[in-house]
């Protein structure tokens, strides 16, 4: 009898002990990347799990080519991960409209999230007046150049269209391509260039007016911007020598070309900082960055196009909403963790838009990236920013702006007709309440 009783008590102690120390799982579906995955496992998943005793974060990696569709399928079935990661606001809008995401207003108020984030970035996750997404990373488009090459030849880094076309001629005379970039493997690369020309020819104010419906996309200033892009792409071959070459090369190719002086410059997003540093660093040359050149007097000088790279939301059907909220709040409450992870990518990934001071940037970060971060904060802080298409364009016109651009470049449709179709898609999106949040301009 005593033996039985002791056995019962001992079993009860084990059960109580196990219950006290067991954790509830929190799942997060994340895009896989061979270089990034180990860092996210160590510095995000494992760090969070070690920091508290209530929840066990499990990051589930999958290539975006299949993840986006499998995520949509599971969400439609009332399943899916607790933390929903999307490629941007247009995806958030789709899930929010379908009632698949948790309203985060009460949590934002409780934990003070609005006071921790850059204002425009916080507003990018507000749909129909409520918060549904937090940016996992924010980014911009910049111009990179081979600083060593420019100094050797006495070339001036272009800040205007005239200066760009002048240095382009000098670069081509040396047998090099002006810009390297390409869309092989990722057709939406086209929208990077379209956005550059819309914002830096027509200007951010004009783009903003079109986004909110106060100006038509058929306005001559937008037509002129895309006519200039077509001229530079097709007639003058500023990107990799020709349109055909641009279509033929991808990420590894254009980084290699930039690193080996095959091209003097590259227009690309800030997500490239790590790859560029590693690539050109091996050649012995030094790289520099600059804001994209102003392409007309209407652009009102240099600006940084703002964008959200990926977003974090909570599944409305999550098995562990409390745990998912705890993960998000832990990220936003631990600036050092965010900076440490972002530093591993030279601030090209996991750039959660927390309010940072210049003193927050680690000394280990390259001087080029440090300079960019400070200049970006200064210029965007003054309200001088443009708009990337993948963050502020609704779904249908957002696809049209890159997918059908090849038809324009092939000469099968005029820029005027293309923009006429584009305006009709915006009208349709506005009528169906599919437009995305956009920060107000002063």
Where are these regions (language model features)?
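Extracytoplasmic/periplasmic substrate-recognition and gating elements
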Residues: 46, 50, 77, 153, ...
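Hinge/lid segment of periplasmic solute-binding proteins
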Residues: 87-142, 156, 165, 171, ...
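Extracytoplasmic "Venus flytrap"/periplasmic binding protein-like
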Residues: 43, 47-120, 126, 148-159, ...
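C-terminal capping/gating helix-and-loop segments adjacent to ligand/active sites or protein-protein/ligand interfaces
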Residues: 126, 211, 368-427
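Short, solvent-exposed loop/beta-turn-alpha elements that line the ligand-binding surface or hinge
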Residues: 103-117, 200-224, 278-282, 294-303, ...
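A structural signal for short loop-to-beta-strand junctions that line the ligand-binding cleft
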Residues: 81-82, 113-149, 177-183, 192, ...
């Amino acid at each position: 009898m005593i033996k039985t009783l002791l056995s019962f008590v001992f079993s009860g102690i084990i059960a109580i002990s196990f219950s006290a120390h067991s954790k509830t799982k929190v799942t997060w579906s994340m895009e896989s990347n061979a270089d990034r995955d180990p860092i996210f496992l160590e510095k995000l998943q494992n760090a969070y799990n070690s920091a508290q005793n209530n929840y066990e974060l499990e990051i589930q990696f999958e290539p975006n080519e299949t993840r986006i569709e499998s995520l949509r399928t599971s969400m439609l079935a009332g399943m899916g991960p607790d933390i929903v990661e999307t490629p941007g606001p247009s995806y958030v809008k789709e899930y929010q409209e379908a009632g698949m995401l948790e309203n985060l207003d009460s949590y934002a108020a409780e934990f003070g999230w609005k006071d921790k984030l850059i204002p425009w970035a916080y507003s990018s996750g507000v749909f129909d007046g409520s918060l549904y997404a937090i940016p996992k990373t924010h980014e911009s488009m910049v111009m990179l150049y081979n600083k060593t090459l420019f100094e050797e030849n006495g070339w001036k880094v272009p800040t205007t269209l005239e200066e760009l076309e002048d240095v382009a001629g000098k670069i081509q005379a040396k047998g090099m391509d002006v810009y390297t970039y390409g869309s092989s493997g990722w057709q939406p690369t086209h929208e990077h260039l379209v956005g550059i020309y819309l914002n830096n020819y027509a200007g951010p104010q004009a783009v903003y007016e079109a986004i909110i419906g106060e100006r038509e996309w058929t306005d001559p200033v937008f037509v002129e911007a895309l006519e200039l892009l077509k001229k530079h792409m097709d007639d003058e071959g500023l990107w990799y020598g020709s349109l055909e070459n641009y279509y033929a090369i991808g990420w590894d190719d254009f980084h290699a070309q930039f690193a080996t002086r095959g091209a003097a410059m590259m227009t690309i997003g800030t997500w490239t900082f790590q790859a560029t540093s590693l690539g050109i660093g091996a050649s012995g040359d030094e790289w520099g960055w600059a804001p994209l050149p102003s392409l007309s007097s209407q652009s009102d000088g240099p600006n940084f196009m703002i964008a959200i790279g990926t977003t974090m939301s909570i599944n409305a059907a999550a098995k562990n909403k409390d745990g998912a909220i705890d993960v998000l709040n832990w990220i936003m409450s631990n600036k050092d963790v965010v900076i440490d992870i972002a530093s591993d990518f030279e601030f090209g990934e996991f750039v959660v838009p927390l309010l940072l001071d210049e003193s927050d940037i680690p000394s280990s970060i390259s001087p080029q990236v440090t300079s960019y971060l400070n200049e970006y904060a200064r210029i965007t802080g003054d309200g001088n920013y443009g708009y990337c298409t993948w963050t502020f364009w609704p779904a249908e016109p957002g696809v049209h702006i890159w997918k059908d651009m090849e038809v324009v470049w092939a000469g099968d449709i005029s820029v005027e007709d293309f923009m006429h179709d584009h305006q009709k898609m915006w009208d349709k999106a506005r009528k169906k309440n599919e437009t995305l949040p956009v920060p107000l301009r002063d």
